[in-house]
């Protein structure tokens, strides 16, 4: 689909990265718009993975970014209904969820191995114990948006049995609701329960790739902006392994972007700058850092607004 405004990209890709990843991405989008840069909410298409699927759904469902910011930063009385039930539980089991997140990152890095990675990924998924928690309260929040598959929204997940990627919005539109697709995309293996739909079982889309940027579509003159909070060190993982995993995630994202660029697509990938990385801290699931992470994202977006605004200004 074409963008809905002349200063917006054709496609916005919103990657995984936990609750703080969503907070940072929301802040960046707000900062870009406030500073006169591209309006990400008016993109023609959104591709969301894990936390990015929440943000993509909120945007296409009509939730203003400023309102989402208030919910994430706790300034609204409904913040607890969407953030705390999930991430308060995570805070009580930091070791378990960080191990799950580290495993997720490792599986995403497997894509660098090529076609054989599918078999390794499937073996990994079969060895991971089924998660004990669910994201039902998040599903209720998505349901209240009343959103159907409208052509603008794509959400990624991975089939638990085959370890293949699925793209809701391209497939399963008759058998999987938008809310179930979001829950599937956020179902971190080993922590959250897998999500069933259309006769199949799904887990976090980040198992395949934290951004799934390659789905953005390519072609001469197309424009893509990817907000990617992933690729930083995960707390609780040995330093060397963490560095290797983070490097693999960044390399995979670079390869995905390079493929689009070879076909003539303009791709802009935005990652947390130094200040935002400090705000996010060592764990992307730390809900006590939401407000400062949103603020850091806004500041980063404001800093990028002028240069990106020139790139996306009407001819």
Q: Which residues are covered by each model-predicted region?
A:
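Patatin-like phospholipase
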Residues: 1-49, 54-315
């Amino acid at each position: 689909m074409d963008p809905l405004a002349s200063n917006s990209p054709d496609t916005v890709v919103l990657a995984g990265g936990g609750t703080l990843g969503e907070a940072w991405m929301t802040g960046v989008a707000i900062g870009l718009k406030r500073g006169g840069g591209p309006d990400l909410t008016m993109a023609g298409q959104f591709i969301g993975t894990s936390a990015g699927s929440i943000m993509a759904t909120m945007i296409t469902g009509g939730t203003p970014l400023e309102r989402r910011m208030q919910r994430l930063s706790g300034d609204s009385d409904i913040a607890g209904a969407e953030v705390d039930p999930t991430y308060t539980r995570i805070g009580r089991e930091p070791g378990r969820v960080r191990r799950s997140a580290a495993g997720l990152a490792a599986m995403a890095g497997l894509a660098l191995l090529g076609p054989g990675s599918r078999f390794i990924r499937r073996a990994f998924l079969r060895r991971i114990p089924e998660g004990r928690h669910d994201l039902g309260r998040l599903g209720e929040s998505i349901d209240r948006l009343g959103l159907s598959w409208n052509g603008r929204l794509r959400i990624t997940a991975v089939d638990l049995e085959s370890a293949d990627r699925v793209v809701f919005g391209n497939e399963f539109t008759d058998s999987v609701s938008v809310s179930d697709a979001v829950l599937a995309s956020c179902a971190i293996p080993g922590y959250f329960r897998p999500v069933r739909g259309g006769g199949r079982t799904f887990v976090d889309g980040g198992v395949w790739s934290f951004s799934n940027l390659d789905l953005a579509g390519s072609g001469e003159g197309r424009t893509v902006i990817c907000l990617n909070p992933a690729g930083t060190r995960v707390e609780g993982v040995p330093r060397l392994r963490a560095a290797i995993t983070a490097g693999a995630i960044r390399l995979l994202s670079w390869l995905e972007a390079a493929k689009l660029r070879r076909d003539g697509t303009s791709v802009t990938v935005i990652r947390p700058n130094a200040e935002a990385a400090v705000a996010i801290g060592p764990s992307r699931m730390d809900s006590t850092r939401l407000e400062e992470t949103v603020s850091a994202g806004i500041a980063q977006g404001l800093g990028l607004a002028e240069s990106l605004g020139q790139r996306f200004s009407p001819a």
